[in-house]
């Protein structure tokens, strides 16, 4: 199938990914007002057309944090990305690398920092939640440094966990626990189950 729009990809994901993990990516906390506001803000961004100008030397390259990239965008951190598709973080990092843009690995990733580093050739960014357990956070920073991550992306809004209604309804928790309520949904996605069984990281 040829994917032309983001909606095409959303529809395909709905068919292939178990509902709990599909809804996790598309939902937010509480009334989801911030999620809606963010979407509305992106819709307001538009390109200004310029005509009758020389575009033969157009260039989207940009330096960010001392590194030259093909365009000034980055893949944002997505928690549990490896549950959308087996080795999801690795595949996303490789895709970002092929397009010449930075990838940001989430603290809540399925694939480890080391696993992503072993399967990529360019440094990636690491997202760190600012948490009360300073010793744990320090260990994560040390691992990111050892993996030669080129930037640390701080997330500061973890003081209070938001109530995610879709996750509650779907029985999704961290650490992930398989319950009878969603076993049938998993069974209905045999290809997803088969890919997960063959993934590089099953922890």
Label every PLM stretch briefly.
Residues 1-67, 171, 175-203:
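An N-cap/entry alpha-helix motif that binds or orients negatively charged groups
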Residues 61-72, 81-93, 109-121:
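N-terminal active-site wall of soluble small-molecule enzyme domains
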